[in-house]
Amino acid sequence: MLNNSGGKHIHIGPLSQLTLLRVRRGLRKFGIPENRFVHIPYVRSVWQALNEYRVDLYVASFPFGGGRTLIEAMGAGVAVALHLHCHSRLLSTFDMAFEGTMLWRNPQELYNYVQQADAETLKQQGQAARRKYLECYGEEVLAGALANWKQPLPAPPLLAGYAPDNLQQAIDITNQVSCLGALRRIFCRAIRRWKSSRA
């Protein structure tokens, strides 16, 4: 993605030392200066961090989206690129986003978007994100909901553009129920337990 954007990538959230080593090795392999990848393990406010680092595109968590962080990014007026989960619109936080959000299912779609997006497009997307935030998630919306707590909030409309990927879903199910898939899950859980016991 850094190759395609020509900008910086700011990763907010924990990364293992092994992952950081892999990232640095990848940067060297492609001749990308290490200062174009910034790792911030923790911030109190994603919204403030996005503004402080002048981020113009937020690539949402994937394959499982993070709704709260998506709302913070939209509140900050930052354009959003959302991963379309192969069989759940809920897990991509698809319907929480604004109409016209950049959607991607495979890495090449994301790379193409990053390569083609110009400053004006990202600015317009950021403005659309901010409008969606004010319309659905702003403090006034919350205050109104709390003041009229007996009245149910209207459900937001489902956005157009989501279609499940049945082939990928079938592959996922096959991997999960096969012996190899079960062994892989057992191994990954054991590794996670071991890591958490050392923390």
Protein language model features and the residues they cover:
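Glycosyltransferase donor-sugar binding loop
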Residues: 8-22, 38
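Nucleotide-activated donor-binding/catalytic signature segment of Leloir-type glycosyltransferases, i.e.
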Residues: 22-42
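Acidic, amphipathic alpha-helical patches
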Residues: 23, 45-49, 70, 110
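Conserved active-site histidine-acidic residue motif and adjacent donor-binding/catalytic loop
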Residues: 35-51, 65-66
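Catalytic binding pocket for nucleotide-activated donors in carbohydrate/polymer assembly enzymes
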Residues: 53, 57, 61-137, 148, ...
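C-terminal amphipathic helix plus adjacent low-complexity
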Residues: 111-199
